[in-house]
Amino acid sequence: PGHDYKYKNFSQKQITSIIDLSKNLKKKYKIKKENILGHSDIAPLRKKDPGEKFPWKLLNKKKICLWHNLSEKNCKKFRGIKLKNSDNFFQLLFKFGYKPTNNKNEKIKIYKNFQRRFRPQLISSIVDQETYIILKSLV
């Protein structure tokens, strides 16, 4: 079930299936790992799925999708520390590929979906230094 229905961890069977399917589709259609996206990457104002419990990091280890190469231990010390200038973050986020907006509520939705994908340990509306460091490593 999704976020509105007691969002649960993906089963091992689901994870194995998505790995096998993704590998086959990548090979068949010559898809680059940068182009493997979730609903929330494409429509972050409307979608949250696949969400923070989706195994993006594992899929990256299987050479399926994009993930940052930073250690959680090194990044964690910046978690929750508010970024002084969030405009820099959003300029970089829009450069990364998210649709630009000046609407504050839309920016927060986009930001949270970026966190669901690349920093799933904490989903927050505070634009923090850890998320900025992760984004910088991807752009």
Q: Language-model segments: which ranges?
A:
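Cell-envelope/ECM-targeting effectors and their regulatory/trafficking segments
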Residues: 12-30, 45-139
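Feature activates predominantly on carbohydrate-active enzymes
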Residues: 7-8
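Residues forming anionic-ligand binding surfaces in small-molecule and nucleic-acid pockets
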Residues: 1-4
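Catalytic metal-binding/acid-base residues of hydrolase active sites
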Residues: 41-43
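Surface-exposed patches in mature extracellular/periplasmic domains of secreted proteins
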Residues: 28-38
